[in-house]
């Protein structure tokens, strides 16, 4: 009887103790060098939020000499931040297994900027000698500007 009670007490102690597991290692790639919009990801490392939730997160910055997209496909990254859904659509088109797991901006934050007083609407801007548009913009809002406002690819 003493052996049974000892076994039961030992079992209860083992079952009630917290089992410490190693944190899940995750490598997260950003779409550019560290900037304000990425701040929360870095803050979660600094203040221990990821560790608190069982994650060991490493952030791999993107940038002018770093294309993180192939790193995701090669398994060097677990998650990748992109500027918009165009890369995800392209991955689907090319049969690359991709899953979108979160959207952090409700809209794709892009802007057209000019010096004060030169251009007050799209019709004025159409007459500008040069309009510089980001690569992402060329495949999203620029197509709308060409169709709706008569801009030209020149």
Predicted regions mapped to residue ranges:
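Bacterial N-terminal signal peptides
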Residues: 6-16
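Positively charged n-region of N-terminal signal peptides that target proteins for export
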Residues: 1-4
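Short, glycine-/small- and polar/acidic-enriched structural segments
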Residues: 25-154
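Sec/Tat signal peptide C-region and signal peptidase I cleavage site
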Residues: 18-22
């Amino acid at each position: 009887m003493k052996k049974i009670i000892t076994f039961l007490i030992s079992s209860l102690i083992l079952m009630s103790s917290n089992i410490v597991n190693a944190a899940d290692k995750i490598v997260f790639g950003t779409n550019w060098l560290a900037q304000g919009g990425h701040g929360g990801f870095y803050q979660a490392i600094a203040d221990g939020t990821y560790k608190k939730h069982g994650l060991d997160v490493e952030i791999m910055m993107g940038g002018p000499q770093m294309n993180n997209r192939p790193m995701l496909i090669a398994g060097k990254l677990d998650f990748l931040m992109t500027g918009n859904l165009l890369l995800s659509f392209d991955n689907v088109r090319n049969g690359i297994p991709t899953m979108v797991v979160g959207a952090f901006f409700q809209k794709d934050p892009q802007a057209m900027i000019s010096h004060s007083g030169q251009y007050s609407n799209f019709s004025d801007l159409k007459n500008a000698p040069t309009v510089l548009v980001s690569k992402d913009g060329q495949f999203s809002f620029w197509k709308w500007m060409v169709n709706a406002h008569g801009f030209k690819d020149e």
